[in-house]
Amino acid sequence: MRKFDKSIAAFEEAQDLMPGGVNSPVRAFKSVGMNPLFMERGKGSKVYDIDGNEYIDYVLSWGPLIHGHANDRVVEALKAVAERGTSFGAPTEIENKLAKLVIERVPSIEIVRMVNSGTEATMSALRLARGYTGRNKILKFIGCYHGHGDSLLIKAGSGVATLGLPDSPGVPEGVAKNTITVAYNDLESVKYAFEQFGDDIACVIVEPVAGNMGVVPPQPGFLEGLREVTEQNGALLIFDEVMTGFRVAYNCGQGYYGVTPDLTCLGKVIGGGLPVGAYGGKAEIMRQVAPSGPIYQAGTLSGNPLAMAAGYETLVQLTPESYVEFERKAEMLEAGLRKAAEKHGIPHHINRAGSMIGIFFTDEPVINYDAAKSSNLQFFAAYYREMVEQGVFLPPSQFEGLFLSTAHSDADIEATIAAAEIAMSKLKA
């Protein structure tokens, strides 16, 4: 049995200092019934907690660390920038360099604005969509999480799903009434919503792969249908690629599925582990953003040199060949997890999109939030705790996916499959 005495003591102290002892709810490990692990350091595919335990890491800071922990080039870039100054409140050339890379690789983006988080990106994109179209309502999908902005924290996923809250207290009714929610992968419901409210729907916002109800890819024709119905009704299509951006493919989720939105939100990978977000799209729309247009958005640390440098060094290391290797590794892990579950007769359903993998403990195919909720949460919690004992660090929620990095080796994946085999053998009915 691993010892967690230092993590337990640190969490006891933290609970007097921060709400629930954490700065983001899912980190409290509530849904898996254990004390959170306090991490001390990471290198490559491994992380180490303050008790000295080593883990193969599939959290990767919830997705940003696509090259693993303490990537040499990212670390050197951060050192070089920090020595010259961490923030200036004035433009820097590194902003141009990262913006050029984003524009080159993301099909929908002609102009991009850097911000500080994924939430900031989605909130800003909604304001832009409303200002550009002159309409008030937005359409989102049940279980899709787009950050904690009031308009979007309605029937959301992620930590909200983990806590079992359909929405959050503090979201005014006047805000909520302008958010229309329908089931993910249900194009007919989208069409019906446009029949009812089409003249006032400014945008549809969607994750190309729903990553905060587990990993739920789009059904064939779903994204194409959203593109068609928004164009027909004069609404904008926004892809929230905070999670999928540069994660599932070289050209992001939109390149992976061949559907180009009007606006795209980015985060996670483009900051290399530092706080960052971005939103961009057609020049005609983005030129409505201040100071070139009337739609206001600003940020003290937006485009700060540290995040821009980390993001630039992260993206330049990603090539089309990187994603061929991601696919090979992800297929290997997916097949191994499936084989272990089948061997022990454990109900399961595995979804994957590129290097994002979700394993659900249910017999039901998972294509939307209702199906995701059919998972056996008690089994997941027990599985999670056993995987920790086996030295594998997974996201502590059934409703979050696993991420791979360029640092994960075949040996890491083989060890993870072996750990899952042991865990499932202990837990089988």
Swiss-Prot record:
A Pfam family it matches: Aminotran_3
Modified residues (N6-(pyridoxal phosphate)lysine): 268
The enzyme's E.C. designation: 5.4.3.8
Keyword Isomerase: yes
Keywords: Cytoplasm, Isomerase, Porphyrin biosynthesis, Pyridoxal phosphate
Listed GO CC annotations: cytoplasm
Record localization: Cytoplasm
Family according to the record: Belongs to the class-III pyridoxal-phosphate-dependent aminotransferase family. HemL subfamily.
Protein name: Glutamate-1-semialdehyde 2,1-aminomutase 2
Organism: Bacillus cereus (strain AH820)
